[in-house]
A protein has these predicted regions:
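Charged, alpha-helix-forming regions
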Residues: 1-298
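Append "and, occasionally, other polyanion-binding protein interfaces
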Residues: 217-219, 223, 233-246, 291-384
Length: 384
């Protein structure tokens, strides 16, 4: 399949960005624990996630289970359904059949039970996000230790005939912190059509490199550290031979698959210098950036339109110029129109410029257009 064909077939869903950065919070089916803790150091700061622990009525800490990779895929499908309904603030009504269709799963009784179980786990299992702080400049939502998050609320509406369940509809609503991030554009595009067909470990690897390689064509990581990044902490994965065997299966699944910013063309395993581990090298062919056919006058006109709608700022102007040069004019104007409509509806609680920055990148990625930005998700914009 060519780059152009991949771009035409691209179907992107906007997932909440924290979820994509921490997809490791979803365990594989082999995980037997009733809770789990994950930590990651960034500079001098430690971020920590605790899944499946809560206090009972007597104040005792209890374990209630963990979220697993199939639940992650259902969550992304819910993001897709929510967006298709116009991004409502309240409950969304759907059905298990629609959920299966969005995930491209063959319908059947066993699948209905599986999807119900995943919806319940997204509703019932708490997550503590420790060390995540509010940052006013990019509207990063704080999730505190004493405020555990459950991804969704859900209500099942079952129709029965002669004691047999013949239809199951459900209503869902995102946690208010997840919903606010979605509305603010604090999101990461995801290829639901790809992840829905991957095995569990391949899903974790795919989502990890899709985030890390957003602005890279190559990425190398030692297998031990990679498995730590993915939350794969089973005793078997302490041994390089087990990690290698798992990754060899992943390579068969992932090579040639489209990421959101290009095609994953190669994954190779090479021994480290001390021969005690091996490096995993990922190579991406980025989607080709369209050659700009705009004159200087056309670029200036588009920049002026963006400044009229979004405001003027020295930092913003460089972003506007890059967008004007690399993005089709009709796409820019569509994104500006959407931004104005979102503001009128009261959905934008941050700045218009930042919302536009997120949205234009999403629209471009959905069409396979590389905008040539060194940073993404609004990092180049003043937020007012």
């Amino acid at each position: 399949m060519t780059n152009a064909e991949h771009r035409r077939e691209s179907e992107l869903t906007r997932s909440e960005l924290n979820t994509q950065k921490w997809v490791c919070l979803f365990a594989t089916k082999n995980y037997r624990g009733r809770s789990r803790e994950l930590a990651r150091r960034v500079g001098n700061h430690v971020f920590k996630i605790v899944v499946g622990k809560q206090f009972d009525g007597d104040g005792r800490e209890i374990e209630v289970g963990v979220l697993k990779v199939p639940a992650y895929k259902v969550l992304v499908a819910l993001f897709h359904i929510w967006e298709s309904r116009g991004k409502p603030l309240d409950w969304v009504t759907s059905s298990l059949y629609e959920l299966a269709d969005v995930m491209d799963r063959r319908w059947g009784g066993s699948l209905a039970k599986e999807l119900k179980d995943q919806l319940r786990s997204l509703r019932d299992i708490p997550i503590q996000w420790i060390g995540f702080f509010y940052r006013g400049e990019d509207r990063y939502i704080s999730i505190l230790e004493d405020q555990p998050l459950r991804f969704i609320k859900v209500k099942f509406l079952t129709t029965k005939k002669a004691g047999r369940e013949i239809e199951c509809r459900f209503m869902f609503k995102f946690d208010e912190r997840i919903l606010e991030n979605l509305l603010l554009g604090y999101t990461k595009p995801v290829r639901l059509d790809v992840i829905s067909k991957l095995s569990e470990i391949a899903t974790l690897v795919y989502c990890h490199v899709d985030v890390v390689m957003a602005d890279k064509t190559e990425y190398t990581r030692r297998s031990r550290e990679l498995f730590e990044d993915l939350g794969l902490t089973s005793k078997r994965y302490k041994y390089p031979s087990w990690r290698k065997a798992a990754l060899e299966r992943v390579i068969e699944e992932l090579v040639g698959k489209p990421l959101t910013t290009g095609i994953l063309t190669d994954i190779s395993l090479r021994p480290t210098k001390d021969r005690k581990d091996f490096n995993v090298r990922f190579v991406k062919e980025p989607f080709r950036r369209p050659v700009s056919q705009k004159s200087d006058a056309e670029v200036r006109e588009l920049v002026e339109e963006m400044e009229r709608v979004l405001g003027v700022g020295d930092k913003n102007r460089g972003f506007y110029i890059t967008i004007a040069r690399n993005c089709p004019a009709e796409l820019i104007r569509a994104a500006l129109k959407d931004t104005v409509e979102e503001e009128r509806s009261g959905r934008i609680t941050g700045s218009k410029a930042q919302f536009f920055g997120y949205w234009i990148q999403y629209l471009a990625a959905k069409r396979g257009i590389d905008l040539g930005l060194k940073s993404s998700f609004g990092e180049l914009l003043d937020t007012g």
